[in-house]
Each structure stands twice: as C-alpha cells, then as structure tokens.
C-alpha cells in the first residue's frame, strides 16, 4: 500500500513540475513576433537618430557614409523574403537552400512554405551577425572610456528577443565580428555604417512579420 502511495505521489509531483515548466516557458505567436519586430524597428531608428545627432562632426548621415551590407552573400533574406506576389519559381529557388534553425512560432501553419521558412531562418542569421558586430563595437566604445556614445541597450534587447522567438530550439552558429580597428574614429564610422544598414534590414523584418500576422 505504501509503495503504491509513493508511486502515486511521485507521478503527481512529476506532472506538476512538468506543468509548471510549461507555463514558465513563454511561447511566441505571430502577433508577439510582430510586436518584437516593431520594437526592433523603433529602437533601431532611435539609435540611428541618436548616433547622427551625437556624431554630427563625423560622416554619419545616409549621404556621407559608405553603405555596406555585412550579410551580402551570407544570407538569403533579400531573395527569400520577397513579397509573395513578386516571388517567382519559389520551390526551385528554395529547394537548394538549407535552414539552420527552426522557424520558431512566428510562422503560422496557413502561411508555411519552404520560401517563408528560409526567409525566417535568414532573418535569424542576419540578427545574429548584427548582434555580434554591435556587441564588438560597444565593447570598443566602452574601452575608449570617452562615453561620447554607446549602443542603446533597448535595441540590443530587441534583437535578442526576436532571435529567441525565431529560434525556439536555441541553436546558434558561432559568429566572429569583422571589426578589427581599435581607432576611436574608425569605430564610430563603423557604427554609423552598421546602424544605417540595420535600420533598412529592420524595415524588411517588420514587413515580413506584418505579412505573417495578417489575415
């Protein structure tokens, strides 16, 4: 009798622990992913405006910088995330690509396709690359100890939150920052270049999430 009661107690305890963990683990929805992307766009634009104002004696405006896309030839976002009405030969193009991460829960079942899955995976890789670059630059800015400008933690948090929503399995690829110069001037110029490029990518990401959240 005691043995049966012990087994029943352990089974009940295990069930309650499992239920507690399930409730404690937040699961994103397309609507939440859209909210994350809107927050990303808002915080990125705020950081870009702050950089242009703070670094007014640097070539930091869109007209002055040398535009650079650090994701060029490394991710498929620009091709995979085309609006459906513009995408042609979707199955043929996407069949030769591989997805390194799961789509998380940003992609609703009714809009699942190989191209859209690749699009979300590419967005995740974009975010990972920019996150690595921004963290490296922020470390340099802090090391210079002039506190003229540092990255907004709200933007870095927004990047991390959207990455978590896109990658529920927690799979990551190691990234190495391209920043090599420790010269304060070059670091600030690099910051401006990255912020302009990332603000454009944030617009694309927000458009994709808006489409996935539409009826």
UniProtKB/Swiss-Prot annotation:
Q: Which GO terms describe its cellular component?
A: extracellular space
Under SUPFAM superfamilies, the record lists: 4-helical cytokines (SSF47266)
- N-terminal signal peptide: 1-22
Q: Which Gene3D superfamilies match?
A: 1.20.1250.10
Q: Please provide the record's keywords in A-Z order.
A: Cytokine, Disulfide bond, Glycoprotein, Growth factor, Secreted, Signal
Gene for this chain: IL12A
Q: How does it assemble?
A: Heterodimer with IL12B; disulfide-linked. This heterodimer is known as interleukin IL-12. Heterodimer with EBI3/IL27B; not disulfide-linked. This heterodimer is known as interleukin IL-35. Interacts with NBR1; this interaction promotes IL-12 secretion.
What GO biological process terms are annotated to this protein in UniProt?
immune response
Q: What does this protein do?
A: Heterodimerizes with IL12B to form the IL-12 cytokine or with EBI3/IL27B to form the IL-35 cytokine. IL-12 is primarily produced by professional antigen-presenting cells (APCs) such as B-cells and dendritic cells (DCs) as well as macrophages and granulocytes and regulates T-cell and natural killer-cell responses, induces the production of interferon-gamma (IFN-gamma), favors the differentiation of T-helper 1 (Th1) cells and is an important link between innate resistance and adaptive immunity.
Its primary localisation, in coarse terms, equals secreted
Q: Please give the residues the UniProt entry marks as glycosylated.
A: 89
Compartment annotation: Secreted
Name its species: Sigmodon hispidus (Hispid cotton rat)
Family as reported in the entry's similarity comment: Belongs to the IL-6 superfamily.
The record's section on Pfam families has:
IL12
Cystine pairs: 33-106, 60-192, 81-119
- What GO molecular-function term can you cite, just one? growth factor activity
State the protein's name. Interleukin-12 subunit alpha
* Stretches of the chain forming a coiled coil according to its record: none
UniProt superkingdom: Eukaryota
